[in-house]
Amino acid sequence: MKFIIKLFPEIMIKSDSVRKRFIKILTSNIRNVLLRETEQVAVVRNWDFIEVRAKVAEEIPLILDLLKRTPGIHHILEVQEMPFTSLHDIFEHTFAKYQNQLVDKTFCVRVRRKGKHEFSSLDVEKYVGGGLNQRIESARVKLTKPDVTVRIDINGDKMLLVEARHEGLGGYPIGTQEDVLSLISGGFDSGVSSYMFIRRGSRVHYCFFNLGGASHEIGVKQMAYHIWSRYSTSHKVRFVAINFESVVGEILEKVDNGQMGVVLKRMMVRAASQIAERFAIQAIVTGEALGQVSSQTLTNLRLIDKAADSLVLRPLITHDKEKIIALAKQIGTDDIAKSMPEFCGVISKNPTVKAIESKIVEEEGHFDFDVLEKAVQNATYLDIREIALQTEKDVVAVEATSALTEKDIILDIRSPEEMDEKPLVLAQAQVIELPFYKLSTQFAHLDQSKNYLLYCERGVMSKLQALYLKEKGYQNVKVFNLPK
């Protein structure tokens, strides 16, 4: 099977040199993504499209799923390639493929052609369309809005019959734009804003300000890992965690109640600017939307930006909450966000919506900035690919096993798409399907007299979720490894 990758239209209108660079980067990204999962694939770059050849038929659904989640791809054509010798040969190949699909249907033929031939694209459309109309009695030609569009691509002495068209993610390939640092809290907004910059071609690193202990950090790591694993595995990214509990304590003790929200955000962008400068990252990304909460008025946002040494970007600035939640649902972060508490909103009871700069500066004069510097100096840096290993060191260890007892139930915590693609079937073992993002709300409703062995394909999410449940006080959880 062969896939033809069509590029995001904005790439095609670039100058020749820029377009060539973008296509080269996208080809490299596709290789990186696919080769993490299978070696039975070939990727070939062309002038205005990319070919992907699947060598093993069983891996076609996996390859297609990965391509649909790769930024820079407008759409994917699933095609069958075959040689031809004449115009009639093209018709015969097309008839063999479509004779059953066109019964009692309206259809039209659309042809794209490259190379030197004795016929034009219109000649092929007329010949093949007329032949199909004659051979299939119940079929009828309809040039506008037909039931079936027969698509044929001709290149030299080969023809491609398009079996299916799949929409891609769009956007620019990761690496065509400069890196950004996303301030991720685990809520709806920060996850969506991170995704939007990934789709726009930036490599997104993550900076997390821990206000709620180990369980809060585990939850945010789950979201960051989920976004990375679905949309940006072509690139290595960093996860930076800064313990901000001491900073919050200093603010609570020394800053006027009404100014706390703005001061906290200013401390965050100060710290993030230092991290960004260290790694030559050009901008900070936040999930703020205009007027959504008290600190997100134009006056307050301007004062927050004044504390930053880096450019602050807000892709959601005009988005409604309803639209943000819909996007979170689309990318699979909504259920994680639902279980995440909003710590920033609880430190100020009467927040100002129109902070005065002189007042903010005065309040920050009471703040001991050594506390902030110490928090930044003690930040932890993690390659997101090693997130499970680092978590094991930081939090209570979780037992992993492949042996089962009568009290053991396996919890398949993969996403519904992964479950459908590779169902987990084990002889003499009860398997319950419960996606990882529902564990925080539904685990308590399970029979707690049983032991639950959490399973995911790579073991990353199962370890994180087991650690999260241990933090919540559940001792009847382990990680399940498939027997070899």
Swiss-Prot record:
GO MF terms, alphabetically ordered: ATP binding; CCA tRNA nucleotidyltransferase activity; tRNA binding; tRNA-uracil-4 sulfurtransferase activity
Organism listed in the record: Haemophilus ducreyi (strain 35000HP / ATCC 700724)
Family recorded in the similarity comment: Belongs to the ThiI family.
Catalytic activity: [ThiI sulfur-carrier protein]-S-sulfanyl-L-cysteine + a uridine in tRNA + 2 reduced [2Fe-2S]-[ferredoxin] + ATP + H(+) = [ThiI sulfur-carrier protein]-L-cysteine + a 4-thiouridine in tRNA + 2 oxidized [2Fe-2S]-[ferredoxin] + AMP + diphosphate; [ThiS sulfur-carrier protein]-C-terminal Gly-Gly-AMP + S-sulfanyl-L-cysteinyl-[cysteine desulfurase] + AH2 = [ThiS sulfur-carrier protein]-C-terminal-Gly-aminoethanethioate + L-cysteinyl-[cysteine desulfurase] + A + AMP + 2 H(+)
Record-given protein name: tRNA sulfurtransferase
Biochemical pathway: Cofactor biosynthesis; thiamine diphosphate biosynthesis
Domain Rhodanese: 404-483
Enzyme Commission code: 2.8.1.4
NCBIfam families reported in the protein's UniProt record: ThiI_C_thiazole, tRNA uracil 4-sulfurtransferase ThiI
Function: Catalyzes the ATP-dependent transfer of a sulfur to tRNA to produce 4-thiouridine in position 8 of tRNAs, which functions as a near-UV photosensor. Also catalyzes the transfer of sulfur to the sulfur carrier protein ThiS, forming ThiS-thiocarboxylate. This is a step in the synthesis of thiazole, in the thiamine biosynthesis pathway. The sulfur is donated as persulfide by IscS.
Residues at the catalytic site: C456 (cysteine persulfide intermediate)
Gene that produces this protein: thiI
Location of the THUMP domain: 61-165
Primary localisation category: cytoplasm
Record key words, sorted: ATP-binding, Cytoplasm, Disulfide bond, Nucleotide-binding, Redox-active center, RNA-binding, Thiamine biosynthesis, Transferase, tRNA-binding
